[in-house]
C-alpha cells in the first residue's frame, strides 16, 4: 500500500500520497483581514488622533487635544443587524481636552465621534444589513525608484523618481546633452543644481565640494543660469507658480510646505524604511573598489585599505562601523529653504567602475540613516538621491524593477480605513479652527467645537461606495474565503484597467510563495486581481512574506527554524525546492541541488544553499490548492478550475471529494461558513438551532468546568447570491471538543470538509453526438435522487409609503381582484408562510391612492368620520416575478409604530422569502476541478445509459476530445484514482505538487483489483451490446455552477417600453425584448423581406398607435392594419429641429406632410380605440 492515513478533523480519514512532511501548519487563512483591522483599532486610530492633536486657533490661545478613545458595545448583534438592515457598528467616544492659555482654564469632555463599523469574527463587515468585504490593495510602495530609458536616438539615459505616500513627486532625468534635470510635481524641468542652490548651496564651488568633480555636474552647472540661493528659489517659484510675483520669502515657504511639512508630505513608515534602505551607504558599496582608506574616527584604527574591493565578507565586517560613525561629515548650508544651517551626510570615495584607467574617483553619499520618526523628505535624502543618480551614470548602483514585490505593497483594511479616517479628521480640523475663532473663548466647550459630520461621512462613503468595499461573494465557503484573501491592483490610488500594461499583469518570479500565479480572473482584469498564497503573511510595512526553512551554514543541515522573508530579502539567498531529498538528520542527500536565485533556476552544490521551501503548496492560493493533480494540468485550465470552484452552488446533500488534496478541511474551517469552537470544552446540548459547549479550563493541573458558550446555527438563510445558507451540527452531546474545532458544517460542507460537488461515475465516451463541443450527457438518476438539487432563496420586499395623495396601505382589499387570487393571503394581505406561489401571484396586497383632485375640507372631514372608501385607489401589490415560483419560506414585517428603523417616508416594510428547489436541468452548466466545463445537452433515462459489466449504469458521459487539446490530464488521473478509492472504501488526499504519481495510481488500481489501465468494457443500455473499445470509467468530482438555465431563460410578447423612444426595453431584468439591430435589418433587406422588415421597424417596435391597433386586430381575428409612423422618427425630427434645422416631410407626391396631421390621426385613432397613448405601458 502506498501513502499513509491522516486524520482531517474529527470525522474524516484520508490516505495521503504526500512524500514531504508538513513542517509548518497553515496560518489562519483570514488573518490578513482580522489582524489588519485589530491593528487599526489598537494603533491606527491612536496614530490618527496623535497626528491631528493638538489643534490650535490662529492666535494660539485655544488648544484642543485628543487624549484617549474607546469603543462601546454595538447596538445590535451581528444576526440582528442583518435582519434589521442596519450597520454592525460600535460607538466611538473620544476624550478631548480644551485649554484656554489666557485664563489657564482646562475643560475635559468625552465626545461621541459616530458609530464605527466593526469587523465580524469571520473578517467581514455588515453595512446596511449586507455583508461586505474590504479587499486588500496592491500599490507601488513609496520610495526612490531609478530606471533606465532609451531616447529616440538610441542613447541610454536614466530617470529617478521619489514617490511619497502623499505629497509632491520629485523626478530626476538626463537629456541628450548629458545634463541632469529635476522636475518638481510634474512641472517643467529645471537643472538639478537649481534645486541644490535652493537648499542652501549657493555657489558652484559649494556644489562641487558637495558632490565631487563630475562631467555631468559640470554640464548641468553650465546650463544653470542662477548663481545664488535667492535666484534659485525665485526660479523654482516661477516654475511652480507661473504668473505670480515671486519673492524669496514666498519661494521658501512654498518649497518648505511642498517637501518639509509633515502634514503636506508623508513618506509613511514604509517610505522612510525603503528610502533609508536604498540610499544608505552600506547597500551601495558592495563590489566597489575603495579610493580612500576607511578609518574609525574614535580609535584611529584602519577598517579597510584604499584599493580593496568590498565583497560580502568585508561588508559584513565593516557594517557596524558604517552604521555607527565612519565617513560622516557635516556640510554647511546658507540662505536655503531649510532653517537648519547644516546637514549630516556619510560619504566614501570609490573608483568609478566604468573608467578604463580605473583612476576616476567618484563619491558615494548616503543619507546617514535619517531617523524613522521623520516621515517627510530631508535635505540629506535629496542630496543622497541626486548622488545615487550621478553614481548610476558611472555604473554604480542598480535600477529598480517596479513589478518586483519588493516594490509593491499591500494596503489592507486597517490602512485603507486609516487613510479614510484621516480625510474625515482633517476636514473636521478645519471646522474646529473656524469655530475657535468665531465663538466666545470663555463659554466654549469641546463638544461645541467638534463637528463629527465629516468624519462619519468619510467612513460611510468608504464602506458604501469605495471600489475596494465589495458585496461579499457568498456563493459557497470557498468563494467567501477567496474574496477575503483577494489582492486588487485597481481602486483609488491604484491602476486602471485601461492603462495597465502587460508587465504589471504578468507573473513575476517574486510572486513565488506570496501571490498565486494561477488564480486570477479571465478577461479585462487578468493579472490585476490576484490571490494571496497559502502560507503568505503581510509584515508591518505591508510587504508580503513567505516562510522558508533555514539551512545552518556551519553544518549544512536544514533546521526547524522558520524565517519569513520579503521578496527583497529573498533576493540575497539561494533557496532550495521543498521536494529535495533530506537525510534523517536534515542534511541534503544529493551533492548538487536545484535551487532558485533571483528568478533563475540554478544547480548549486549543497553547501551554497541558504534556505529551503516549507511546502510545495506555498506557491499557490487556497482555491488552487484544492485541485488534485494540479501538476498534471495546463496552467490556463487550472486557472479556470480554480475560478469555477468559487461558482459551485451548495447542493441539497453535500459530499466531500473522494480524491481531495487535504486542503478541504482547512479551507472550510477558516472560511467563516462553519461554526468553530472558541475554547476547549464539553458539548452539553445539540439541537438543529444551537450548540452549547461548557468550557474546560485547567486550574492547578486539574480540569474544571467553566462558562457556557452558546453557538447559534443559521438555518436556511438567504446568502448574498441567493443560495441557501444552512448550518448542521456534526458533534454529539458529551463530545470533548478542542479549541478551533468545527462544531457545525456550513453550506457546501460535509464532516468538516469543503464539499462543493458530488462524486459521480463518469465515462469518457461519445453518445450519438450529444456531447459535441464539451456538452455533457447525464443520467436521469441524478435528477430522481436529487444528486445535483440545490436550494435557492429569493427575497422580495414591498414598502408602504406616504404619498402626496395619502398613505399607501397594505391590505387584503384589492380592487378588481378575484377571491381566487387572494386565497393564500392572510387578513393583513400578506401571503402565508408555506404557500406555493406561481409567477404573477400576489405576495403582498397593497393599494395606493390615485386621487385626481385634492379633497375639499368637507370631504376630508366626512372621510375621517365615516372612513368611507370613496377615494380612488389603484392596485400596486407585490407580485412574484417571472421564474419566481416556489414556496414561501418566511415573512418579515417592520412597522414604524413598533419602533423599527425605516427610511424616511416609509410606514411599513414587508419582506417575503421564497425558496426554490432546483433539480439539475438541460442547459445548466457543470464542471470538474480541472477547468473541464460543459453544458448539459441531454438527460437520458437510466436504462439507456451505458452500463458496467456488473450492471451499474454510469452517471455522466464526457467527450474524450475535451482532454488532449486542453492538456488537463489531471482529470484522467483523478478518474482512475477515484474509482480505485471507491472500490477500497477510502478517501484519498493527493496534495498539489506532492501528490500521487502515475505509479501510485496504477498501484492503487491493482490494489482495488482493477485493470492497470483503468479501462473497462461498457454495454449499450439500449441494445445490451458491448461497445467496440474499452472505455475509461471512474469516479470524478463534478460541481454544478451558478450559471443555471432557470436564471437565463426569458421570453416576452408585450412588455414595458422606453419613455422617449417608445421602443421595448432590453434585458431579462426589465422584461425586455430581443434587440433587432442594424445588421439584422441588413439581413432582411438582403432577402427583400419587405413586409417583415416594415413590421419589425413599426408595430413590433415603436409605432405606438399601430401596435395597439395590431393587438386589437389580432384579438378580433381581423387583418393587421397599415403601420403608422415610428416614434423614434418623430424624436429624430424634433432633435434636428432643436439644432435649428428646418426639417420637412414630403409625401410620394412631394406634398408636405405636417407633423401635426400625424399627431391628429393618432389622437383620432386613440379616441376610437379608447386608449390613453401617453400611458401605454410606458415604464422607463
UniProtKB/Swiss-Prot annotation:
GO terms for molecular function: DNA binding; DNA-directed RNA polymerase activity; ribonucleoside binding. DNA-dependent RNA polymerase catalyzes the transcription of DNA into RNA using the four ribonucleoside triphosphates as substrates. PROSITE patterns: RNA_POL_BETA. The lineage of its organism: Bacteria, Bacillati, Bacillota, Bacilli, Bacillales. Residues 1154-1164 have a biased composition (Acidic residues). CDD domains: RNA_pol_B_RPB2 (cd00653). Its EC number is 2.7.7.6. Residues 1154-1180 are annotated as: Disordered. The keyword Transcription applies. PANTHER family: DNA-DIRECTED RNA POLYMERASE I SUBUNIT 2. Residues 1167-1180 have a biased composition (Polar residues). NCBIfam families: PRK00405.1 (NF001616), rpoB (TIGR02013). GO terms for biological process: DNA-templated transcription. It catalyses: RNA(n) + a ribonucleoside 5'-triphosphate = RNA(n+1) + diphosphate. This is DNA-directed RNA polymerase subunit beta. Disulfide bonds: none annotated. InterPro entries: DNA-dir_RNA_pol_bsu_external_1, DNA-dir_RNA_pol_su2, DNA-dir_RNAP_su2_dom, DNA-dir_RNAP_su2_hyb_sf, RNA_pol_bsu_bac, RNA_pol_bsu_CS, RNA_pol_bsu_protrusion, RNA_pol_Rpb2_2. It comes from Halalkalibacterium halodurans (strain ATCC BAA-125 / DSM 18197 / FERM 7344 / JCM 9153 / C-125) (Bacillus halodurans). Keywords: DNA-directed RNA polymerase, Nucleotidyltransferase, Transcription, Transferase.
Amino acid at each position: 500500500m502506498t501513502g499513509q492515513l491522516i486524520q482531517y478533523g474529527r470525522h474524516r480519514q484520508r490516505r495521503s500520497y504526500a512524500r514531504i512532511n508538513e513542517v509548518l501548519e497553515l496560518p489562519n487563512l483570514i488573518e490578513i483581514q482580522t489582524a489588519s483591522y485589530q491593528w487599526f483599532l489598537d494603533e491606527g486610530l491612536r496614530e490618527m488622533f496623535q497626528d491631528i492633536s493638538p489643534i490650535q486657533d490662529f492666535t494660539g490661545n485655544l488648544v484642543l487635544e485628543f487624549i484617549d478613545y474607546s469603543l462601546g458595545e454595538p447596538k445590535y448583534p451581528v444576526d440582528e443587524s442583518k435582519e434589521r438592515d442596519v450597520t454592525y457598528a460600535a460607538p466611538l467616544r473620544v476624550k478631548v481636552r480644551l485649554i484656554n492659555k489666557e485664563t489657564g482654564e482646562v475643560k475635559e469632555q468625552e465626545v461621541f465621534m459616530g458609530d464605527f463599523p466593526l469587523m465580524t469574527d469571520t473578517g467581514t463587515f455588515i453595512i446596511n444589513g449586507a455583508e461586505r468585504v474590504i479587499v486588500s490593495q496592491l500599490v507601488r510602495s513609496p520610495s526612490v525608484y531609478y530606471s533606465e530609458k532609451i531616447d529616440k536616438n538610441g542613447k541610454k539615459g536614466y530617470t529617478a523618481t521619489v514617490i511619497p505616500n502623499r505629497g509632491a513627486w520629485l523626478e530626476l532625468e538626463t537629456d541628450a546633452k548629458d545634463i541632469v534635470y529635476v522636475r518638481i510635481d510634474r512641472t517643467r524641468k529645471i537643472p538639478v543644481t537649481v534645486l541644490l542652490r535652493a537648499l542652501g548651496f549657493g555657489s558652484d564651488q559649494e556644489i562641487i565640494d558637495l558632490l565631487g568633480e563630475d562631467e555631468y555636474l559640470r554640464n548641468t552647472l553650465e546650463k544653470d543660469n542662477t548663481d545664488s540661493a535667492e535666484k534659485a528659489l525665485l526660479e523654482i517659484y516661477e516654475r511652480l507658480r507661473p504668473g505670480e510675483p515671486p519673492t524669496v520669502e514666498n519661494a521658501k515657504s512654498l518649497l518648505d510646505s511642498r517637501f518639509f511639512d509633515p502634514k503636506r508630505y508623508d513618506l509613511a513608515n514604509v517610505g522612510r524604511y525603503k528610502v533609508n534602505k536604498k540610499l544608505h551607504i552600506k547597500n551601495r558599496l558592495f563590489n566597489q573598489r575603495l579610493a580612500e582608506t576607511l578609518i574609525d574616527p574614535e580609535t584611529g584604527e584602519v577598517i579597510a585599505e584604499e584599493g580593496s574591493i568590498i565583497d560580502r565578507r568585508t561588508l559584513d565586517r565593516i557594517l557596524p562601523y558604517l552604521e555607527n560613525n565612519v565617513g560622516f561629515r557635516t556640510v554647511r548650508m546658507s540662505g536655503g529653504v531649510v532653517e537648519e544651517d547644516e546637514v549630516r551626510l556619510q560619504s566614501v570615495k570609490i573608483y568609478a567602475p566604468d573608467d578604463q584607467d580605473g583612476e576616476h574617483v567618484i563619491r558615494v553619499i548616503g543619507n546617514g540613516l535619517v531617523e524613522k520618526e521623520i516621515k517627510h523628505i530631508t535635505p540629506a535624502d535629496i542630496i543622497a538621491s541626486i548622488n545615487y543618480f550621478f553614481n548610476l551614470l558611472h555604473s554604480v548602483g542598480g535600477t529598480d524593477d517596479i513589478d518586483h514585490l519588493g516594490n509593491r505593497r499591500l494596503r489592507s483594511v486597517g490602512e485603507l480605513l486609516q487613510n479614510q479616517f484621516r480625510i474625515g479628521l482633517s476636514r473636521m480640523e478645519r471646522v474646529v479652527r473656524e469655530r475657535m475663532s468665531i465663538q466666545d473663548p470663555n463659554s466654549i466647550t469641546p463638544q461645541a467645537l467638534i463637528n463629527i459630520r465629516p468624519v462619519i461621512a468619510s467612513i460611510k462613503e468608504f464602506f458604501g461606495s469605495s471600489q475596494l468595499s465589495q458585496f461579499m461573494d457568498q456563493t459557497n465557503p470557498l468563494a467567501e474565503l477567496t474574496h477575503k484573501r483577494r489582492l486588487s491592483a485597481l481602486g483609488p490610488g491604484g491602476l486602471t484597467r485601461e492603462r495597465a500594461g502587460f508587465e504589471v499583469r504578468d507573473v513575476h518570479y517574486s510572486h513565488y510563495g506570496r501571490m498565486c500565479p494561477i488564480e486570477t480572473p479571465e478577461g479585462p482584469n487578468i493579472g490585476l486581481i490576484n490571490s494571496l498564497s497559502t502560507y503568505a503573511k503581510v509584515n508591518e510595512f505591508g510587504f508580503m512574506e513567505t516562510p522558508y526553512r533555514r539551512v545552518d551554514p556551519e553544518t549544512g543541515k536544514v533546521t526547524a527554524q522558520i524565517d519569513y522573508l520579503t521578496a527583497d530579502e529573498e533576493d540575497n539567498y539561494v533557496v532550495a525546492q521543498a521536494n529535495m531529498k533530506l537525510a534523517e538528520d536534515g542534511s541534503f542527500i544529493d551533492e548538487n541541488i536545484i535551487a532558485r536565485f533571483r528568478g533563475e533556476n540554478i544547480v548549486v552544490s549543497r553547501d551554497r544553499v541558504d534556505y529551503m521551501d516549507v511546502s510545495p503548496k506555498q506557491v499557490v492560493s487556497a482555491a488552487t490548492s484544492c485541485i488534485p493533480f494540479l501538476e498534471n494540468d495546463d496552467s490556463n485550465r487550472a486557472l479556470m478550475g480554480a475560478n469555477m470552484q468559487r461558482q459551485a452552488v451548495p447542493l441539497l446533500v453535500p459530499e466531500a471529494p473522494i480524491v481531495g488534496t487535504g486542503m478541504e478541511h482547512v479551507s472550510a474551517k477558516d472560511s467563516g461558513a462553519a461554526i468553530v469552537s472558541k475554547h476547549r470544552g464539553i458539548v452539553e446540548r445539540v439541537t438543529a438551532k444551537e450548540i452549547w459547549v461548557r468550557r474546560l479550563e485547567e486550574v492547578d493541573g486539574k480540569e474544571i468546568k467553566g462558562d457556557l458558550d452558546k453557538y447559534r446555527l443559521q438555518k436556511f438563510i438567504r446568502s448574498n447570491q441567493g443560495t441557501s445558507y444552512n448550518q448542521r451540527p456534526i458533534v454529539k452531546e458529551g463530545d470533548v471538543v478542542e479549541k478551533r474545532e468545527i462544531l457545525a458544517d456550513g453550506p457546501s460542507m460535509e464532516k468538516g470538509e469543503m464539499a462543493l460537488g458530488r462524486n459521480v461515475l463518469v465515462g469518457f465516451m461519445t453518445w450519438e453526438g450529444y456531447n459535441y463541443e464539451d456538452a455533457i450527457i447525464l443520467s436521469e438518476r441524478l435528477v430522481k435522487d436529487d444528486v445535483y438539487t440545490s436550494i435557492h432563496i429569493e427575497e422580495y420586499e414591498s414598502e408602504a409609503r406616504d404619498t402626496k395623495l395619502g398613505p399607501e396601505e397594505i391590505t387584503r382589499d384589492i380592487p378588481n381582484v378575484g377571491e381566487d387570487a387572494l386565497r393564500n393571503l392572510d387578513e393583513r394581505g400578506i401571503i402565508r408562510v408555506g404557500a406555493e406561489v406561481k409567477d404573477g401571484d400576489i405576495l403582498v396586497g397593497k393599494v395606493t391612492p390615485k386621487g385626481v383632485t385634492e379633497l375639499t375640507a368637507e370631504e376630508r372631514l366626512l372621510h375621517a368620520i365615516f372612513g368611507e372608501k370613496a377615494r380612488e385607489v389603484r392596485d400596486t401589490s407585490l407580485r412574484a416575478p417571472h421564474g419566481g415560483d416556489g414556496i414561501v419560506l418566511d415573512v418579515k414585517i417592520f412597522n414604524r409604530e413598533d419602533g423599527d428603523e425605516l427610511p424616511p417616508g416609509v410606514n411599513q416594510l414587508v419582506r417575503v422569502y421564497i425558496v426554490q428547489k432546483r433539480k439539475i436541468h438541460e442547459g445548466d452548466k457543470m464542471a470538474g476541478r480541472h477547468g473541464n466545463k460543459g453544458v448539459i445537452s441531454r438527460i437520458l433515462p437510466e436504462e439507456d445509459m451505458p452500463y458496467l459489466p456488473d450492471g451499474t449504469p454510469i452517471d455522466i458521459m464526457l467527450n474524450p476530445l475535451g482532454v488532449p487539446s486542453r492538456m488537463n490530464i489531471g482529470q484522467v488521473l483523478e478518474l482512475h484514482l477515484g474509482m480505485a478509492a471507491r472500490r477500497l472504501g477510502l478517501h484519498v488526499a493527493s496534495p498539489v505538487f506532492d501528490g500521487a504519481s502515475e505509479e501510485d495510481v496504477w498501484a492503487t488500481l491493482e490494489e482495488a483489483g482493477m485493470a492497470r489501465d483503468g479501462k473497462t468494457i461498457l454495454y449499450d443500455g439500449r441494445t445490451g451490446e458491448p461497445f467496440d473499445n474499452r472505455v475509461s470509467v471512474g469516479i470524478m468530482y463534478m460541481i454544478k455552477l451558478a450559471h443555471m438555465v432557470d436564471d437565463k431563460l426569458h421570453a416576452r410578447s408585450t412588455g414595458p417600453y422606453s419613455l422617449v423612444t417608445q421602443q421595448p426595453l432590453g434585458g431579462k431584468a426589465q422584461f425586455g425584448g430581443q434587440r433587432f439591430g442594424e445588421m439584422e435589418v441588413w439581413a432582411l433587406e438582403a432577402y427583400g423581406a419587405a413586409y417583415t422588415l416594415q413590421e419589425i421597424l413599426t408595430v413590433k417596435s415603436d409605432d405606438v398607435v399601430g401596435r395597439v391597433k395590431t393587438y386589437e386586430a389580432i384579438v378580433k381575428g381581423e387583418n393587421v392594419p397599415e403601420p403608422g409612423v415610428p416614434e423614434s422618427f418623430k424624436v429624430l425630427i424634433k432633435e434636428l429641429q432643436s439644432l435649428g434645422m428646418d426639417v420637412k416631410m414630403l409625401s410620394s407626391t412631394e406634398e408636405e406632410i405636417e407633423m401635426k396631421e400625424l399627431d391628429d390621426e393618432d389622437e383620432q385613432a386613440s379616441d376610437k380605440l379608447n386608449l390613453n397613448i401617453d400611458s401605454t405601458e410606458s415604464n422607463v
